[in-house]
Amino acid sequence: MEDRIVTPLNIRGDAESEYSLRPKSLKEYIGQRKVKEKLKIFIEAAKNRKEALDHVLFYGPPGLGKTTLANIIALEMGGNLKITSGPAIERAGDLAAILTGLDDRDVLFIDEIHRLNRSVEEILYPAMEDYALDIVIGKGASTKSIRLDLPRFTLIGATTRVGLLTAPLRDRFGVLCPMDFYDQEELSEIVVRSCNILKIRIEPEASVEIGKRSRGTPRIANRLLKRVRDYSEVKGNGTIDLKTSKAALELLEVDKEGFDSIDNKILRAIIDNFNGGPVGIETLAYFIGEELDTIEDVYEPYLLQKGFIIRTPRGRIASDSAYKHFNKTRKSSNAYHKNLKQSSLFDGEV
């Protein structure tokens, strides 16, 4: 799964290219208009007051620019960026060491913050609220707590599973930023910007085609661009035109919807093996041989956003769009419309 060309997760070779293509300011940053508007106002206000920016939570599918925005915030605030992740902070002492190493206006970015263990998370509460670190020393009757002052820093949390955050942690973030999939026009613009930086010649129709198949995700758009560039240099004349881009994407097995073999495997399983659904997510994960979390975090968000699957109280069902994608006809529409009606009442995850 790590080497899947359309995965929104980081794979080998992404880090170097993402660094060179990463925008350095909100003005350069394409997409996420509402998030940018919020950040622009709050950053300017914090700078005018000579204060640290309030703590920020980014949540949404992977690959949408959370780390890039964290880097921009650090640059705008004139501080350094320290990057870590929830699973990497195993003990309270690990987090204490990070916090005491920060300076005023520095930004601490914790990816997968929903995976912090509870003892580590509790260290964050006074750090976020009071810029203080409570340390317990001694044992038994001689136990006492010492409070250390911390620099005025900004914590930025990122998560793909905001529902897994505890309420006490979530409530301590002053700026909440939901991240949405990018539209085709934004992705095409990102492709053109990347081409300018990498000195790649591309025709407008080709940038649209690559953007259309990028699953609403800039990371995927840039990854596809690099592979289409390779194809163009070997099979074409070095300029990416529409014909070349389509041929390259077909070779990569990325179809017009941005689906690859695994997406199609999921949809075919629901349609062919479970009569269009509903099928429980655990059953579906077992059937196609993938981890439950991988289905929910990586594959499902885009299929839901595209309207190819629908969540209901009884499980996932394939939509009419999914059937049309495979030129198939639903055997019975009565059960589908009944489940579809129930889905409007669905208020949780199955």
From Swiss-Prot:
GO molecular function, one term: ATP hydrolysis activity
Positions of DNA binding: R311, R316
Lineage: superkingdom: Bacteria
Subcellular location, record wording: Cytoplasm
Disulfide-bonded cysteines: none
GO biological process assignments: DNA recombination; DNA repair
Location of the region described as Large ATPase domain (RuvB-L) in the Swiss-Prot/TrEMBL record: 1-182
Region (Head domain (RuvB-H)) location: 256-350
GO cellular component: cytoplasm; Holliday junction resolvase complex
Gene3D superfamilies membership: 1.10.8.60, P-loop containing nucleotide triphosphate hydrolases (3.40.50.300), Winged helix-like DNA-binding domain superfamily/Winged helix DNA-binding domain (1.10.10.10)
Region Small ATPAse domain (RuvB-S): start-end pairs: 183-253
Keywords: ATP-binding, Cytoplasm, DNA damage, DNA recombination, DNA repair, DNA-binding, Hydrolase, Nucleotide-binding
Coiled-coil annotated spans: none
Sites where the protein binds ATP: L21, R22, G63, K66, T67, T68, E129, D130, Y131, R172, Y182, R219
EC numbers on record: 3.6.4.-
Membrane-traversing stretches: none
Keyword Hydrolase: yes
Pfam families: AAA_lid_4, RuvB_C, RuvB_N
Binding site for Mg(2+): T67
Role according to the record: The RuvA-RuvB-RuvC complex processes Holliday junction (HJ) DNA during genetic recombination and DNA repair, while the RuvA-RuvB complex plays an important role in the rescue of blocked DNA replication forks via replication fork reversal (RFR). RuvA specifically binds to HJ cruciform DNA, conferring on it an open structure. The RuvB hexamer acts as an ATP-dependent pump, pulling dsDNA into and through the RuvAB complex. RuvB forms 2 homohexamers on either side of HJ DNA bound by 1 or 2 RuvA tetramers; 4 subunits per hexamer contact DNA at a time.
Protein name per the record: Holliday junction branch migration complex subunit RuvB
Species in which this protein is naturally found: Clostridium kluyveri (strain ATCC 8527 / DSM 555 / NBRC 12016 / NCIMB 10680 / K1)
